[in-house]
Amino acid sequence: MEEIDNKAEKRKDADIMKKYKAVFSDIDGTLLNSKHQIPENTRKKIKQINKNGIPYVLVSARMPKGMTAIRAELEAKSPMICYSGALVVDEEDHPIYSVAMPQEVAMKLCRRVYELNPKISVNIYTNDEWLVKDKKEYWAAQESDITGVIPQEVSFEDEEVYKEVHKVLCMGDKEDIAALEQQLVKEFPQIRIYRSKDTYLEIMSMKASKSDAIHMLKDHFHVKQEEIMAFGDNFNDIDMIRYAGLGVAMGNAADEVKPVSYTHLRAHETGA
C-alpha cells in the first residue's frame, strides 16, 4: 500500500511540475521547521524540481548572507529575493533589483525608536551588510545564531550608515514591540511596518514587496504569472501567495494567511 501511495504522490508531483514553471518559497516557518532545518522529504522534492530545470527561488525577510547557505544546501542555482522584496540578487549574488528607504526617513526612524524605547534592539540592513551598535547585545546575538551571520558594529550617529537602507529590524519583548509598532505606524505612514513575529518588527520602503520582486523575476525566467507557485506562512507572504498562479499556505500559517491561498498544507514540520 505504501508503494502505491508513493507512486501516486510522484504522479501528482509530476503533473504539478508540468503546469508550473517557477517556484518561490519563504524560508522561516515554511521551508525550515522549528529547529531551523529543512525536512528530508522537502529536500528531496526540491532537488527533483532543480533536476527538472524549474527555478526554485528563496524569498525571505533575511539578508543575502542569511540565505546563501540554504540555497547551496538545496543545490539551487537561482536568484534570491531578500528583505521581503527590497533587494533581489542573481545567481552570483549581484544586486539586480533594489528598493531602499529614503536616507532621511531611515535616519529619523532609527533615532525615534531609541527615543521611544532604548531597550529595543535596532538593526540596519544595507545590501549584504547587517549593522548594529553592539553585536553582543542579546537580540542581535540570538539573530546571529539563527542566521549564521555576524553583524558589523557601527556608530548610528554616522549619516553614511543610512545611505541605502533596505530594512530596519527592531527586536524586543512582545509588549515593547507591539507598543512600538502602534506608535511608528502613526508617525511614519510613508514606510511599510509590520510584525513578522511577536518580537520582531520589520520596516522597509512602502515600494518593496515580495510580489513586485516576483513580478520582476517572472520576466527574467520568461514564465507567465499563472505558471508560478508560491509557498508562505506569514503576513508578509500574503501578497506573493495572492500573486502566484498557485498560492500555498503552510499548515502552520497565520489564520489571516490561509484564506488568501488556493490551498494549504499540513504543518511544515512534516516537510509537506
Predicted regions and their residues:
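Short, Lys/Arg-enriched N-terminal segments with co-localized hydrophobic residues
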Residues: 6-16
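Single conserved hydrophobic/aromatic residue that forms the stacking wall/gate
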Residues: 264-267, 271-272
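Conserved acidic, metal-coordinating active-site core of Asp-based
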Residues: 112, 116-231, 235-238, 252
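Asp-based phosphoryl-transfer active-site loop
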Residues: 21-34
